[in-house]
Swiss-Prot record:
InterPro entries: Hyphal-reg_cell_wall_N. The chain crosses the membrane at residues 42-62. This is Hyphally-regulated protein. Residues 914-937 form a propeptide. Residues 591-609, 619-631, 641-665, 699-725, 743-801 have a biased composition (Gly residues). The gene is HYR1. It comes from Candida albicans (Yeast). Nonessential component of the hyphal cell wall. Residues 332-483, 567-857 are annotated as: Disordered. It is found in: Cell membrane; Secreted, Cell wall. One of its GO terms (cellular component) is side of membrane.
Length: 937
């Protein structure tokens, strides 16, 4: 029976064989089996549709010209699928138009097998199947080039395969390959500047030991369910990946593991490279800049703890235009002869697309896709990058030192318990500067994070990042403030690892530092500074368990720990420029250390608004009736001069001078030149407001009238109470001018109106009520309260905002620059922290090669020891504490005429909790300033 079936099949196939076929005009062929012998060519402008077929074979080459279309579709119901075979080893396959193979309506296995001596696509190819069962699609040739668009689509995810090229050869892709619901496992090398886009739960597995992918080629993870997996046992490569984020995955074919020198994964923010490691086998992914190291997480990919995901949106990085060519479903096949009259066009050829995706607003392009695809010049913008070393040397001459402390416990899956402490190299540089307006600062932040992943093991690790210490000479003049010193603290944690039979425990000791703040007292003297090194050894235990037993390895790390010694002195100076300037300066400096320029300018203006709003209404109500009774007649004159002249003069003069003092906050924020410009500008604002006072009072008393009462009460009350208090609260300069004029007019009119009407009725005719109601109150309020109050708040708030903003902004900018220079590790910075206090320190001295001790016969020697801890990113990409740096200041000589010798030498005691504190009479304050300068270094 089988022989008979094969014979019938051969007969039917022979009946459909023909010689070389030239399709010049559009046509539709129907039938279950189609066979074509010889070369087939579809000419431009023609559409050829083969419908209702289950088997279509070509025994020769195939060429589809630009503007031509070839459709092969199975529409015989859901059972019979489409099988297309084009197998020739001596003739090429060339497509410059549209080829569509469609078996989406069937529920059975479909197979697309197209190959030739060479394969070239400059147009569009669509390979569509149902995905209900395993389907395959192969486009193979020894010479394989795609400059156009290839879309491989399944209705749903099945265990189908798609492959391009010939095994262990090279394919060139300069166009777009879209994979939707597919598994793609290339067995070839890949070169070119094109893109492979993974969409709708597509899984891509790349490479082995002899295959490579050029860094210029792009992979685009378009949705949150797609994955890119790289063979772990392979030569080190850098893969260019776009769209990583929102939960999609990058991984290796082996579980991610670290060793004593490297972590399981590391992200380098300066280069945008993510490194994944299976012990000694790393692979690199160029994912772009802007990722947060805290949002990376290790996950499973098909049963292995071998991938990393990112729990955040994709940063706005540039995506090449070739990756943004739309992955469309393609044009529909003509169903009847009437459909052939409508020319079939490419879905991309007739559309103008914008290449800006959700991840990028950089690339924007509108073009005819076929024209651009047929040209081999279509390229993506990409950059190749060398592998970045995980050891980073950092040089900095900044005067700010920031130490970031992270304490993290991460519980991870697996059958082993790993405890590690690691540190990378430390670079120490020194520079010399002299400045009268810059400040030295040291800040410390502490973060705690815990991440837990359920499985059979527990992993705890503590690591440290690169630390940069800089010693700097400066001459600074400031007032006494606060300093932060640190005492050493030891934290011990237990690591538990369990399998099915037993649990083991390891004890890990972590050294940290605890900050404590004290007031500093100014002293005088020189500052000799030096940096020395000692060697610190840290030992950790690594426990590995399999199904039968557990083994332990002891790893010892040796690091060079810097010890910095200094003597420090401070001097104090007082700001000049009048009482008002002094008050403003104090207000600004007290709040400036909190949040830099923002807090400093905000509090300065607050003082101005309170004084202005309080004084305005009191003076206005007190003089309303008096001015009204003195001035007699003149209705228009009294009202206009009372509210207009008093208000305008107070506002003009006070506002102009007051705003000059207030504008100091902007200059401080940009240059950080100090607090002295604030007081000077503030005092000018004071003199300006006195002019407003004189003009207001003269105009008010010069003309007053009965009719003026109506105007005084109406407009005066609205502008006085409403605008005065509002403007005062905004800033120092606005407070001075607006409160002076507005409260005067407002309160004056209210009081004048109330009393004037009563007196007017007793006195008789129109002149009686007019004088009482009008100009007296308006003018007196404008001149008395408005101008006087305008001058004082103007000067005070002006200098306050100037001082606060400058001190805060200078510190903030230095902090940010310091932390950003650390490459490849996660740090956190909080610019402006405690900068107000640190601007009060004054440091002078010279760097020396060795620690220096100064003393005389009548002097007493003191010393203080301080510790600083550094950190490094962990195996899970998050920072951990590791190295403690002991900082030992050089002994400083105290004057021999110290009255209390018993308190001149500080000592270091130990509390019950194991931490150290500095004690010892008056000298403890000097010890604290020494510690502050050490931290600045």
């Amino acid at each position: 029976m089988k022989v008979v079936s094969n014979f019938i099949f051969t007969i039917l196939l022979t009946l459909n064989l023909s010689a070389a076929l030239e399709v010049v005009t559009s046509r539709i062929d129907r039938g279950g089996i189609q066979g074509f012998h010889g070369d087939v060519k579809v000419h431009s402008g023609a559409t050829w549709a083969i419908l209702g077929t289950t088997l279509c074979s070509f025994f020769g080459g195939l060429e589809v010209e630009k503007g031509a279309s070839l459709f092969i579709k199975s529409d015989n119901g859901p059972v019979l699928a489409l099988n297309v075979a084009l197998s020739t080893l001596v003739r090429p396959v060339i497509n410059n138009g549209v080829i569509s193979l469609n078996s989406k309506s069937s529920t059975s296995f479909s197979n697309f097998d197209i190959g030739g001596s060479s394969f070239t696509n400059n147009g569009e190819i669509y390979l569509d199947s149902s995905g209900l069962v395993k389907s395959t699609a192969y486009l193979y040739a020894r010479e394989w080039t795609n400059n156009g668009l290839i879309v491989a689509y399944q209705n749903q995810k099945a265990a189908g395969n798609i492959a391009f090229g010939t095994a262990y050869q090279t394919i060139t892709n300069n166009g777009q390959i879209c994979l939707r619901h597919q598994d793609f496992v290339p067995a070839t090398k890949i070169k070119g500047t094109g893109c492979v886009t993974a969409d709708e739960d597509t899984w891509i597995k790349l490479g082995n030991t002899i295959l490579s992918v050029e860094p210029t080629h792009n992979f685009y993870l378009k949705d949150s369910k797609s994955s890119l997996i790289v063979h772990a046992v392979s030569s080190n490569q850098t893969f260019t990946v776009h769209g990583f984020g929102n939960g999609n995955k990058l991984g290796l074919t082996l579980p991610l593991t670290g060793n004593r020198d490297h972590f399981r994964f590391e992200y380098y923010p300066d280069t945008g490279i993510l490194q994944l490691r299976a012990d000694a086998l790393p692979q690199y992914f160029k994912i772009g800049k802007g990722y947060d190291s805290k949002l990376f997480r290790i996950v499973n990919s098909r049963g292995l703890k071998n991938a990393v995901t990112y729990d955040g949106p994709v940063p706005n990085n540039e995506i090449p235009a070739v990756c943004l060519i739309p992955c469309t479903n393609g044009p529909s096949a003509p169903e009847s002869e009437s459909d052939l009259n409508t020319p079939t066009t490419s879905s991309i050829e007739t559309s103008s697309y914008s290449s800006a995706a959700t991840e990028s607003s950089v690339v924007s392009e509108s073009s005819s896709a076929v024209d651009s695809l047929t040209s081999s010049s279509l390229s993506s913008k990409s950059e190749s990058s060398d592998v970045v070393s995980s050891t980073t040397n950092i040089e900095s001459s900044s005067t700010a030192i920031e130490t970031t402390m992270n304490s993290e416990s991460s519980t991870d899956a697996g059958s082993s318990s790993i405890s590690q402490s690691e540190s990378s190299s430390t670079a120490i540089t020194s520079s010399s500067e002299t400045s009268s307006s810059e400040s030295m600062s040291a800040s410390s932040t502490t973060a705690s994070n815990t991440s837990i992943e359920t499985d059979s093991g527990i992993v705890s690790q503590s690591e440290s990042s690169s630390n940069a210490l800089s010693s700097t000479e400066q001459s600074i003049t400031s007032s006494p403030g606060q300093s932060t010193i640190y005492v050493n603290s030891t934290v011990t944690s237990t690591i538990t690892s369990c399998d099915e039979n037993k649990c083991t425990e390891d004890v890990v000791t972590i050294f940290t530092t605890v900050p404590c703040s004290t007031d500093c007292v100014p002293t005088t003297g020189d500052i000799p500074m030096s940096t020395s090194y000692t060697q610190r050894t840290v030992t950790s235990t690594i426990t590995n368990c399999d199904e039968v037993s557990c083994s332990q390895d002891v790893v010892t790390y040796t690091t060079n720990v810097p010890h910095t010694t200094v003597d420090a002195t401070t001097t104090t100076t007082t700001s000049t420029g009048g009482d008002n300037s002094t008050g403003g300066n104090e207000s600004g400096s007290n709040h400036g250390p909190g949040n830099g320029s923002t807090e400093g300018s905000g509090n300065g203006s607050g003082a101005g608004s309170n004084e202005g709003s309080q004084s305005g209404p009191n003076n206005g109500s007190g003089s309303g009736s008096e001015g009204g009774s003195n001035n007699g007649s003149g209705s228009d004159s009294g009202s206009n001069n009372g509210s207009g002249s008093g208000s305008n003069n107070g506002s003009g003069s006070g506002s102009t001078e007051g705003s000059e003092g207030g504008s100091g906050s902007n200059e401080g924020s940009q240059s950080g030149s100090g607090s002295q410009p604030g007081p000077n500008e503030g005092s000018e604002g004071g003199s300006g407001s006195n002019e407003g006072s004189n003009h207001g009072s003269n105009e008010g008393s010069g003309s007053g009238s009965g009719s003026g009462s109506n105007n005084g009460s109406g407009s005066g009350s609205q502008s006085g109470s409403g605008s005065g208090s509002q403007s005062g609260s905004e800033s120092g300069s606005n407070s001075g001018s607006n409160e002076g004029s507005n409260p005067g007019a407002g309160n004056g009119s209210n009081e004048g109106s109330g009393q004037g009407s009563g007196n007017g009725s007793e006195a008789g005719s129109g002149q009686g009520s007019g004088p009482n109601n009008g100009s007296g109150s308006g003018h007196n309020d404008g001149s008395g309260s408005g101008s006087n109050q305008g001058s004082n708040p103007g000067a005070g708030s002006g200098s306050g905002s100037e001082s606060g903003s400058k001190a805060g902004s200078h510190s903030g900018s230095n902090e940010g620059a310091k932390t950003d220079s650390i490459e490849g590790f996660h740090t956190e910075s909080k610019p402006g922290f405690n900068t107000g206090a640190h601007t009060d320190a004054t440091v002078t001295g010279n760097s020396v090669a060795n620690p220096v001790t100064t003393s005389t016969e009548s002097d007493t020697t003191i010393s203080v020891t301080v510790s600083i801890t550094s950190y490094m990113t962990g195996f899970d990409g998050k920072p951990k504490p590791f190295t403690t740096v002991d900082v030992i200041p050089v002994p400083h000589s105290m004057p021999s005429n110290t009255t209390d010798s018993s308190s001149s030498v500080p000592t270091i005691d130990t509390n019950e909790n194991g931490s150290s504190i500095v004690t010892g009479g008056k000298s403890i304050l000097f010890g604290l300033i020494v510690s502050m300068v050490v931290l600045f270094m």
